[in-house]
Amino acid sequence: MSLPDRSTAVRRSFLSVFWVSVLLIATPSISFAQSDPLHIWVGKPDRPAAEKWVSDHLAKEQQYVDELLAAKVPRTIENTLRPFDNAQNELGVAGSEAYLMFAVAPQKDVRDAGQALAQQIQQANTVLYLNQDVYRALAAVDLSAADPATRHYMERTLLEYRLAGVDKDAATRAQVKKFQDHITEAALKFGRNLQENPNHVVVKDKAELAGLPADFIAAHPPAAEGSITLTTDETDYTPIMTYATSDDLRKRMYLAYTTRAYPANKEILLDVLKTRYEMAKILGYASFADLATADQMIGSAANMKAFLNEVDVASRPASRREYDMLLAFARQKQPGITAIPAYGRFYWEDQYARTTFNFDSQSVRPYFTYDRVQQGILDTAAKLFHVSFKPAPDAPVWDPSVSAWNVFDGDQLVGRVYLDMHPRDGKDKWFSSSPVVPGIKGRQLPEGVLICNFAGGKPGDPGLMQYDDVVTFFHEFGHLMHNILGGQQAWSGITGFSTETDFVEAPSQMLEEFFRDPGILRAFAKHYQTNQVLPIDLIDRMNQASAFGRAGWVQGQLFYSTYSLDLHDRPPDTIDLDAILRTDYARFYPYPFVDGNRFYAGFGHLMGYTSNYYTYVLDKVIAVDFFSQFDKNNLLGGEAAMRYRKAVLEPGGSKAGTELVRSFLGRPQNLDAFKLWMDEEFRGTAQ
């Protein structure tokens, strides 16, 4: 089983578990206050301070709601939509920063507070979206003279209200609130179980780590009795599954990884699925999947199924061909093998690349030290998006390891980004990007944060990264740039990447393609010991190796998408998590299922993306189509870069996703470029 996509960014929606579009009340200046009291982590970072900070924001939110309701008719944009947007600001920033503390705060009491406060804020958000008086006031606003962005904002807001059940009777609205509050609490517990209770694998001696890189072994010294403890964090899991020669070790790690938070999260998941289904039914939908897609580009669960089937047809033959090639290779090396187990996939793909493409994935790691990769990301983004980055050493941060960077467009300060990039005890284990402050044109600068778990960050550790980690870094950084460049709207509710959720991954997935270009890579990839620039022939072989397995990757994404859908398109009393897992796994993976796999207990996307994991597949199609518009001989300097910034990123959420696609491509997306991308490994054109 491949890993689900690392990104977890979500937009504001009542369907989202957490309202994390990060909306903040306007400040009198658009410069950064170095001791900004509006950030929850500034000052004394303890539970009482966090609780007071959130309480203050909730009080301001209520003041804006009262202002809206007290306004005299006629209802106007300024006396109704403006205070509504300000109320959302207060809820948004409170929810975003409370959840941020839940995910990254070094102090356990602050993480505990973040969890409780995130639930409290989501409850307030539910109350706002079930308030009929607010809905009627918004619906009465005269939009005849409104600009297109304001009209789009209002239309989408009213749709979200209807999807929340505002037009239902009092009893139904009360039940919806009860359901929403329950889901929020359960989802937070699901995430907390993953965050604070990772599984471990213990090896008896260093010999069991045969095949692992020397720096990995050095970073895992044995205990007094000689045993070595490995975690299921990405920094341990991925190297073990890729390089360990021991089948037994890989199998134990695989099962440890796919049983994280089991059985506790199994019961939580079943409870959430039941509650979502019941909520969808009282809102008039056949299933939660139908409710969850009603405000998306895809439009309906039926459209989602049709799209996934179309991609399945396009990718299945190549995926099976890849597996046959891999199995034939494995049989040459290990006569008698009848199938490649799930825990052998990454190992055999790496071995295949070494022989077929003369590419050892360990050979590029010395060229990708964390510090140089970070600088390379900043330099590449600066050239591509026509911005610059300057350190902000005086910016308050929640941990000394976090760095802050100011973003400039020419001489104009346009935003700030925070990088929290290395593992810590109690910190979220995944890779994600989130807004921290939404931009409001002329009033407020946008801020965003990267939460990752890459190697490095410790004295003496150069932080050697795998190529896939480098690509992930640029992917997540793309979300930050979307938040900054799209954060110049008049309304906080449509700023940054507050588009439909099933568009939000497309810009970042497109950026992944840039890091196959030799010129871009060689600008920063240098050997940490010799300072040698990454050789072009090594890049060519790396690109050939990375092109192999694309169709299988797509099939893996279809598995995650289909499993997410299958858990949300039927009555909960018919759901058997393990039976559906086995069925969907067998449909999309040729690798035999490993008994004991309970991956759903660690599949956090089921909480945030609910039924809509298909987002990653749809957005990959869009991303590859976008990339096809760039001049491959001048990726950073061609005309497409600025045109892309203007057409796709700068509008933020002020336009529908379909309009953003058409604006850049001149047409709707199609599968043509995607099919060529999948077929590249068989055309011998990887470069």
Model-derived features: where do they sit?
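Bacterial N-terminal signal peptides
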Residues: 13-29
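N-terminal secretory signal peptides that target proteins for export/translocation
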Residues: 1-13
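N-terminal helix-rich structural modules
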Residues: 34-213, 229, 630, 687
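C-terminal, non-catalytic "cap/extension" segments appended to globular domains
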Residues: 34-48, 52, 56, 227, ...
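Short, hydrophobic/amphipathic alpha-helical patches that form generic packing surfaces
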Residues: 89-100, 155, 159, 255, ...
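Short His/Asp/Glu-rich catalytic/ion-coordination signatures at enzyme active sites or charged loops
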Residues: 37-49, 97-117, 139-178, 231-266, ...
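Active-site-proximal, well-structured secondary-structure segments within enzyme catalytic domains
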Residues: 153, 185, 192, 197-231, ...
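Short pre-active-site segment immediately N-terminal to the catalytic Zn-binding motif
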Residues: 455-474
